[in-house]
Amino acid sequence: MADLTFKLYDLDDNEIKPKAVLSYELSRDADAACDGLRLNLLLDEAGAELYTVKAFYGKVCAFNGYVDTQRESINANGSTCFLYCRSSACLLVDSEAKPFTYNSPSVNALFEIGIGDGFRLCMDNVFSDIQYQVSKGTSKFGLINDFVFNVTGNRIRVNPKNEIVMLKSERVIKIDRDRILSVKREINRGNAVMGVDYKLNSSDDYLYHRVSRFMQKKRISATRMLNMSNVPDWQRETRLSSFVSNANAGYCCWELKLSGYADIDLADIIRTDLDGFDDYGDVVAVGIRHTCNASGEYTVIKAYSALDLEELSYVDE
């Protein structure tokens, strides 16, 4: 029996009870605004246009979203139905924010002006005393996410309670070794960056440098060049630090396959007694896939080691 249970609703918010759940795949990714759900099920009859889907792990809502695709095959035994759904963040991703330039904005003000009903902002107030420009084509999700990232270096996500929160966690998940079906580790040196050479004025040379002593110790020599002259002063430090950390984020990557449904969320810290598991620092979940099909039920976790890059800055004399 699957660990997740599902509730389906039509356009009139009437619950449609499936005859059976054949398979599901629930995916979360730190690089994606929306969680995704693929669901195959049997219905007594076809015809109802499904609108929303919720998934529960016990009494806890694990997914709250909207149907993007509904595909049915009808025969004498009823209807076989495939659903692809995105989490409620899709309402913000699919809607455009008003192009505007805000003076000394805060995330609270941007939320009140640009998001509207249906969501709650659940984070400490983030603010800046500089202008923030929202360009044409920016989504409502991007309105909040881009501002928070430029100020703090952190991204946001929308959880199943429709709460807008920071994509970070201090929760530690301990995984029993007996539950682990397989483990993979990758060291990705090809994309790693030792440092950045940058300039603050377009007429200057690349006199400023940010290097990672950690990557120097690993004998990584690759560097990148950035022109920071068009980057507002208040965004420069975040932009530099984020560039180096993002380039090296997947240096040590883990994939753990666990039996059953694992109650874990993005950015949770993973602990296990595998040899060498935390040699590069805390291991943080960046992707989660829960699957149930004819082969059984399992969870695959993609995780990165949170490196201490030991960053050092200097200027040419």
Where are these regions (language model features)?
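Charged- and aromatic-enriched interaction segments used to assemble
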Residues: 79-188
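Residue-identity detector for glutamine
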Residues: 70, 131-133, 216, 235
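Assembly/oligomerization scaffold segments
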Residues: 1-97, 149-152, 157, 179-181, ...
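Broad hydrophobic/π-residue packing in well-ordered secondary structure
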Residues: 37, 65, 101, 125, ...
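An acidic/polar, Gly/Ser/Thr-rich interaction patch typically located in mid-to-C-terminal regions
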Residues: 17-46, 183-317
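Generic preference for hydrophobic/aromatic residues in regular secondary structure cores
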Residues: 4-8, 52-58, 97, 102, ...
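Short, acidic/charged, Gly/Pro-enriched secondary-structure junctions
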Residues: 2-11, 40-72, 103-117, 259-282, ...
